[in-house]
Amino acid sequence: SLSTHMIIKSLSGDVDFIITIFSRFVFSIPFLILIAYFSRKRLFLKVNNWKNVLLRSFFGFITMIMVFSSLQLIPFGLTTALAQSSAIFVTLLSPYILGEKIGLIRWSAVIIGLIGVYLMLDPISLINNTTNLSSLGLSLAVCSAFTHACLALILRKLGKSEHPSTTALIHNLITSGIIIFAIVIFGTKFYGKTGTYGIDILITPNLIFTSLIILGIVGSLVQYLMALSYKYTEAAILATVRYLAIPLATFFGYIIWNEVPTSQQIIGGLIVIGSCLLITFREIRKTKLSVK
């Protein structure tokens, strides 16, 4: 998903926020229709549990809006690190949503991870106005981690009753409809740029329009490939690859946007990576023991 985030951040100065969101979902639909149809034929829109599918769409939409917004307000690497802390919130919420019991090791990992998040947020500097970071951007990034955790827990439930290609397609269809409605009613007056009910997208430069199409296609590929990866690859390997996104995002943030993280942000990011990996590997070990 780093590729989609990089496109979004690159477009933030040229394209209205709502148009970026619109493109991400609408241009994903054709590819997702093909995947769903070839996977399930005439049953490609069949759903067994509409309540959970709608909840999946809600939390997926809210999470994406907050991540996309924070990318425009705070450094690329910091947004990624805070968003990747969702594993901490999954552990916090799982006893209440899934009824799971959390042991001492995972609770310890959660506490350590929250310390890492605290270090990255650096609230003391925000209160004293000694940092140029946006408090709104930081808040959105942390909230996106929380809503992504809710999404992950819902996806666990959906995995038992729904096909991933169908839920992904319906999620994009519902969200696209909501965004089109918002554009018709409110226009594109988001983040200080004013459009004429979305029509300005037709007169943007070719490169920007192409980038928006690529954003949608890449977004649909990310959804599909993630589903495949969880099907064919061990969770431990995926967890390691997932948290590589934090140093990679920091690297690209420095190379492309000249964003230099503070030592406190680096330490906090490393703590979050460590705690999330501990939670992940503990979960894998628990699963293997239960199978035996």
What is each residue range found by the language model?
Residues 2-3, 33, 57, 61-65, ...:
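Hydrophobic/small/kink-forming positions within alpha-helical transmembrane segments
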Residues 2-15, 20, 65-76, 82, ...:
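Juxtamembrane C-cap of transmembrane helices in multi-pass membrane transport proteins
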Residues 14-62, 147-154, 170-189:
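Transmembrane alpha-helices of multi-pass small-molecule transport proteins
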Residues 23, 80-85, 159-174, 220-254:
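Helix-helix packing/entry segments at the starts of transmembrane helices
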Residues 32, 127-191, 202, 291-292:
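Transmembrane alpha-helical segments that form core, pore/gating elements
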Residues 42-66, 136-142, 194-221:
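Loop-to-transmembrane-helix transition segments
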Residues 86-111, 247-266:
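C-terminal transmembrane-helix exit sites in multi-pass transporters
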Residues 105-124, 264-283:
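Hydrophobic transmembrane alpha-helices of multi-pass small-molecule transport proteins
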